[in-house]
Amino acid sequence: MRTRHTPILPLLAASALLTAAAPAPDARVTLLDAMAEELQRNQQQLKLQNHDAPYFMSYQLKETEQSALTARYGAIFVDDTYHDRKLYVDVRVGSYDFDNSGPEEYEYFGGGRGSSYVPNPDGPIDDSPLALRTSLWLVTDQKYKAALSQFLKKKGDNVYAVEDPKQPPSFSKEKPARYVQTPVAFPFDHDRWARVARDVSERFKAHPELFDSEVRVTADKVKRLFVSTEGSRIVTEETMYGLHVSAVTRADDGQLLDDSRNYYAPTEAGLPDDKKIADAATKVIEELLALRKAPAIDPYTGPAILAPEAAGVLFHEAVGHRLEGDRQDGDGEGKTFKGQVGKQVLPPFISIVDDPTVRSLQGEPLNGFYEYDEEGVKGQKTVLVEKGVLRSYLLSRRPLEGFLLSNGHGRSQGTRKPVARMANLIADSTKQVDDVELKKQLIAEAKRQGKPYGLIIRDITGGNTNTSSYGYQAFKGVPRMVYRVDVKTGEESLVRGVEIVGTPLSSINRIMATGRKQGVFNGFCGAESGNVPVSTVAPALLLQEIELQRAMEGKDRPPILMSPASSTTASGEVK
């Protein structure tokens, strides 16, 4: 009988090839499993004697990676990278109908005995399941004790409060979500962007009137892992690239003037090319030099056209913030639109939706895109105003009367508590005219009101608003490029020195007509839950009346000596 000997080395080699071909485990899922395991342990065992156990818990790990370059005067000033992981733990005691959540005072109650140490909400940068679980364990313990304290305080306060039969539940019941996003590439050509930043910032040296300037390039990646006792398991990744060109100068009367161009994109390739960046710098220079020579105008009340970006800021400040669901409750809020569902709140030709599911519009990327919000609810298109009639609010998992489910707008920055926030606010109109006709109507309205001119606001830096009940219900916008339109000749002349002010209901109901083309305003919005990326899309607006107040004038002198950068000879010597 002959024995056949099989070669061992080829088998070992084949085995090695099979092993090498096996995909590496997804580190994100490994960490997600660790979070779920620690969550389950706390769900089953966490309970203080003679007190309630949590009825709901969720864990979120938010990992941020950032690269940033800043150049001034042709040189790099900032060359940074940043990487961290932050934890947010939500622990709720009671029930969906009545739990520890409520006004801010409950959030801070329990700051006395037993809470002299607050654990750090950082997560490990290393992919260590045990270290992650340990960090979550410590934060969960602190959050549970605080939740118990808040719950008892809330129950005590209810002894003195009149029962409200229309009081909505404390927390919405949502279906669990399962989603693991494919990893997103995060390239950043450091050398190229350093060169671009240097070259573009160099262009400002030829204009000593612009005494400071900056070119900033950023690349951010946010990875989010979320688990809850309801069964949600979510992994998302988002990237955002930014390029910002800015400069400042002073007018002869001392007023500080600034201008900028800001670009955002979800990919590095989406940022503008070298020529467009150079053109942006040229435009900033030209506009600031023109603003220095422009006359300051007195406060104004009369008709005006708001270009699409400026119109977007108006909708964001005057309408959007007041439709955030969390602002419809609580004694500290003005509740401008509470109880107005089904009623006319805007002109009948205006409709507004907020849609975090839209990545881009007309080729422009939108900052407010996301898959799931910070409470584990899928982002949803929400009709807010339909033909002038209020239909809904932006909703987190904090229910409102008549709105018991979230529509995926619970948003936050870092470790802040999520609240209802805007994402992509999109305004549309059925009363559209072209730009030429819009200007004709502006002139006609100014004549009707006996005004020597109307205004066109073509650019705006942003705005802010007050929604609380402790102050005036007002908003403010900071226009940058304002043009006075002579009613006799139609000639446009640049002016400066004013800010838009107004009350929301009055301002938005003075819209007479809109332009045909929508414009995109990308940026970040700051509120209680931090700074979140947002977009506003709107057409140009013709307002029957707008109020502009005098901006802060400032009487500071410009720098006394010439900048050494602008007075340097070819040999490098300063004159």
Identify what each model region corresponds to:
Residues M1-P10:
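Bacterial N-terminal signal peptides that target proteins for export
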Residues L9-T19:
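Bacterial N-terminal signal peptides
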Residues A20-V377, K381, E386-V389, G402, ...:
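Active-site bordering "gate/hinge" segments
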Residues T140, T357, V377-K575:
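Long, low-charge, small-residue-enriched segments that form tightly packed helices used
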